């Protein structure tokens, strides 16, 4: 990984190489094969340095995101996050560039996509840990208990891994059914594999039913009664016809 200082040291050579390449291109068709090879190598070197600068910029942008998160959320969670080795160790940005045989088509779009995915994964993981830590501390206060920082960090990591496994199961269920989108059928199948998750879903359904307005309940009950009456009247008509 090349850091900002490395990119700054090579930035001054970037402009010299650009000026040199412009002078060679202005020479037109009179240049020989040797000069053309030098021109292509110079372009490759320029893109190589640009990629280093770009990777360093994306790395520091990820650090800025983490700093914003630490300032937005309460400060009582900061020592717990700093103790976690997976948060303190920054991921190295993966970067590459593609070119054709002639060396003319060079793009760094893959750099932006790969580093952006890494930064979003870190952001989601940090937010999930903060939520798990806040829930654990709230439950500890409710029950009059005390929880150590390393214990809460381990619980948060386990909860995140469990959530990742549930997401993978849902994706596999949807893929097995020939779908690209997860629906409630996949959630039900995943709940059958875990009693605790099934109980949580049942309690959530009961809470939603309890919060449902009374008018909608009466409408549903009235429509159900009308359907029962219609079915019974149809049965009576069929018996009289016979």
UniProtKB/Swiss-Prot annotation:
GO biological process: homologous chromosome pairing at meiosis; interstrand cross-link repair; mitotic recombination; reciprocal meiotic recombination
Subcellular location: Nucleus
Keywords associated with the record: DNA damage, DNA recombination, DNA repair, DNA-binding, Nucleus
Positions of region (Disordered): 208-242
Mutant phenotype after disruption: No visible phenotype under normal growth conditions, but mutant plants exhibit a defect in somatic homologous recombination.
GO molecular function ontology, one term from the record: protein heterodimerization activity
Gene Ontology cellular component list: FANCM-MHF complex
Positions with biased composition (Polar residues): 231-242
InterPro entries attached to this UniProt entry: CENP-S/Mhf1, Histone-fold
Keyword Nucleus: yes
Main localization (coarse): nucleus
Keyword Cytoplasm: no
Known function: Involved in the promotion of spontaneous somatic homologous recombination (HR) events, which is opposite to the function of FANCM in ordered HR. Only FANCM is essential for replicative repair in the absence of the endonuclease MUS81. Acts in the same pathway as FANCM to restrain class II meiotic crossing over (CO), and acts with FANCM during meiosis to repair interstrand cross-links (ICLs). This common pathway between MHF1 and FANCM is in parallel to the pathway that involves the RECQ4A helicase.
Assigned protein family: Belongs to the TAF9 family. CENP-S/MHF1 subfamily.
Name of the protein in its database record: Protein MHF1 homolog
Organism: Arabidopsis thaliana
Lineage: Eukaryota, Viridiplantae, Streptophyta, Embryophyta, Tracheophyta
